[in-house]
Structures are given as structure tokens and as C-alpha cells.
């Protein structure tokens, strides 16, 4: 019968062999390397997910040609998710004898849920904001130059007279190469009251949600069903 003492003596003798120690060392190194790769892959995946969320302004976005029904918002809130509604469309800005085509985002006060809407400041500091209040509009530098305007002045968009309260420096989705026109952000309520989102408009509606990964995944599955 093999005793414990015999097993211990055998292990001690085998451990003195360089080949065995090299093999065990290689196995340990492989385990450590695999663990490091798995950790790195998980971090990269999280970074990619976060970058995508910052790009669209939320953890998940649902696009539609018409406004989504209230059921979509109610379901998100039932899961403990935050929501934001917006619409994107082209429109023309007028001031005196000048006009300029704009790519407009009309958003509610919660936008963006992820990422930053940054307005330029003359002192060089960033100014992170949400969408403007009713009666206000943000324009990017190209729009201001084209219209010969500055912050604090007024501009007409879609028949609505708005005060320019900020210069857009950065916004979610602002790197879209398809949007060749200068950018503007206005209140969703103003766009609705001006009839810019009515029948026949070229608006693209979007509902954004944000929250913990599990309820976001549950909401995605529900929306796809």
C-alpha cells in the first residue's frame, strides 16, 4: 500500500528534476497570461460599449420615422431606466438678408444621457450642458460665421424666433460625416410648436435610454420582440 510518506518522498525527488520545474513554471505562466488577456478583453469591451453610448447620447437608441408611442417610455421607466426624446432634421436659419441650412437636433431637457454636450467658453474652459430651454438655441462655429451672429443675438429657425445662448463645441453624434451642414441644438418643445415635426417632415425621431446593463438588455429584448 502506498503511504503518504512515500508519496511525499517521490514528489520531493521529482521536484528536483529541472524538466518538471520548467513545465510547472510554464503552466503557471500560461494561467497568469490567460487571466491577464481575459481581463484586458473585458476592459476593452467595456470601453467600446462606453464609447458607443457616448456617441449616440445613451446606452440604447431606438430610431423611428414617427414619434414612438408612450408605451416605450413607460416600459423603460418601469425597468428603472432614464429616457430622453429627440428628433433630427434639416432646417434653414434666417437673419436679416442671410440664410443657412442647418442640421438640427431638437431634444428634451434630459439629453444627452451619456456623453457630453459642450459649449465653447472664451476663457478656454469646457461647459457641459443639456439641451437648451424653450426659446433658446445653440449653434456651432460654422453656423455663427455663416450667419454673421454671436451668442446673445437672435435667429429664426422654422418660423420660431430664438436666442443664441451657446456655441456648440462638442455634441453626441457630432462626428457624423453625413451631416455636412452646420449644427444646431434647440428645445424639442419649440420644434413641436413650430410644426417642424409634423406630417411630411424629414425628421428622424429617436428615444434614448440609459441605466444599468441588465435592465438595458431587458429593454432591448422587449423592444425587439
PLM feature spans:
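Membrane transport/envelope proteins' first extracytoplasmic loop
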Residues: 2-225
